[in-house]
């Protein structure tokens, strides 16, 4: 299966997306992208230690604090913070990690792949959703 087909399959199967680095500021890209995904039926779990809630959902300080199954970890953090997030996703056995545009960390991506996790890197989940699931 091609990468675009795999992306479409992951987006079709996913129900719950944990968004690491989700901002409570509606002007930030993470907020707009996440609001779009929520409006298309995905359960959103904000992961940001600096907020209590976002988009009507309780926020958690880290992935390890999330009490439910996560289908996709969507990362809106600078690359230097990605490896810790990936390590937590591996620990939780999350099936997919999505690093947004300009979030590139080859070492962390390879570590996730070695753990059997599907990885998308340097792509916007909103743009891919629009392109693949019309």
Model region roles, listed by residue range:
Residues 67, 106-127:
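Short acidic, glycine/proline-enriched helix-loop-strand junctions
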Residues 23-28, 34-55:
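NAD(P)-binding Rossmann-fold cofactor-contacting core
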Residues 89-112:
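ADP-ribose/adenylate-binding Rossmann-like module
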Residues 1-13:
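Short N-terminal or domain-adjacent regulatory/targeting segments
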Residues 128-134:
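A charged, well-structured terminal subsegment
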Residues 1-3, 53-68, 72-84:
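Glycine-rich, highly charged phosphate/nucleotide-binding loops
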Residues 17-20:
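Conserved beta-strand elements of the Class I
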């Amino acid at each position: 299966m091609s990468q675009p087909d795999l992306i479409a399959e992951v987006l079709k199967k996913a129900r719950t997306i944990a968004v690491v680095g989700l901002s409570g500021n509606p002007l930030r890209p993470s907020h707009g992208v996440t609001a779009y995904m929520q409006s298309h039926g995905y359960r959103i779990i904000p992961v940001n230690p600096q907020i209590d809630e976002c988009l009507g959902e309780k926020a958690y300080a880290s992935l390890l604090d999330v009490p439910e199954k996560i289908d996709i970890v969507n990362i809106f953090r600078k690359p230097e913070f990605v490896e810790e997030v990936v390590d937590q996703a591996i620990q939780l056995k999350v099936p997919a990690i999505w690093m947004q545009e300009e979030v590139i960390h080859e070492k962390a991506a390879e570590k996730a792949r070695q753990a059997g996790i599907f990885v998308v890197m340097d792509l916007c989940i909103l743009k891919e959703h629009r392109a693949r699931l019309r």
